[in-house]
Amino acid sequence: MSDLKTRFLEVYSVLKSELLNDPAFEFTDDSRQWVERMLDYNVPGGKLNRGLSVIDSYKLLKEGKELSDDEIFLSSALGWCIEWLQAYFLVLDDIMDSSHTRRGQPCWFRLPKVGMIAVNDGILLRNHIPRILKKHFRQKPYYVDLLDLFNEVEFQTASGQMIDLITTLVGEKDLSKYSLPIHRRIVQYKTAYYSFYLPVACALLMSGEDLEKHTNVKDILIEMGTYFQVQDDYLDCFGAPEVIGKIGTDIEDFKCSWLVVKALELSNEEQKKFLHENYGKDDPASVAKVKELYNTLKLQDVFAEYESKSYDKLIKFIEAHPSQAVQAVLKSFLGKIYKRQK
């Protein structure tokens, strides 16, 4: 494990301990144990990409200067705030989607003693973020900007989730509602803001930058987040479950996935009818038929072409940015996700 990742995980223990001894609430042994178990189960279990990228980005913005212990701690704390936000979304998301597994283990709400208590746990996870920010950033000149940033990104993500849910669930299953612009809107709000823009925005604020002056950085990161989600949609169907850590269910769940949107675009009338009949059905035979159609339409090749075009376009945007340090941050992000398998 890299030294920074080790330091990052140490900061998790510090933050957890502070939250379990928060003076605003008198914990009993039971409640403290519950929160600790809930945190350990839901917060540090993923790849930690979003959290670690705050430190990476901050380091690159400092252009190779050695970071002080304080800078490592603070950038890690912001990284963990994003991981907390992610945990809060995922715990509630899994309930809404009736998912079974997450990160290779049963979803939190599926555990026998948890069930719907998970809803309140999600709310607690969300409430931990301002506690962490208050404790460690209250005296910083960018404190209010940080609070604004987290609030705004949370609002954008929840609104993206809403478009996703109402497009997917409300009324009759109607594939004709699905198109690239709808897919793009969902992805932009539901994933790109918190996964791509938020970590870099945190690093920029810590470096004393004004976010208003970096709207082009936001645009590039949202574009990158869109590309990331298209990869995710692709891997949901074509990735190996043991590699991606979950069993893909986008077809059964009638998700507005890039694959189905592309399939609709490329299908003839007969194939469209076939999709309408089989997409969103929970039986393995229908899922297999949809996958077969995806193969007939050569969606793996279509994706490979999309991937290389997106990469070239992003590199062009990034290299037009005036700051070398910001370019380095953006290229580092792109390098982490290009051609990923999980």
From Swiss-Prot:
Subcellular location: Cytoplasm
GO molecular function: (2E,6E)-farnesyl diphosphate synthase activity; dimethylallyltranstransferase activity; metal ion binding
Subunit structure: Homodimer.
Residue positions binding Mg(2+) 2: 93, 97
Swiss-Prot/TrEMBL catalytic activity: isopentenyl diphosphate + dimethylallyl diphosphate = (2E)-geranyl diphosphate + diphosphate; isopentenyl diphosphate + (2E)-geranyl diphosphate = (2E,6E)-farnesyl diphosphate + diphosphate
Keywords: Carotenoid biosynthesis, Cytoplasm, Isoprene biosynthesis, Magnesium, Metal-binding, Protein transport, Transferase, Transport
UniProt protein name: Farnesyl pyrophosphate synthase
Tissue-specific expression: Mostly expressed in roots and seeds, and to a lower extent, in leaves and stems.
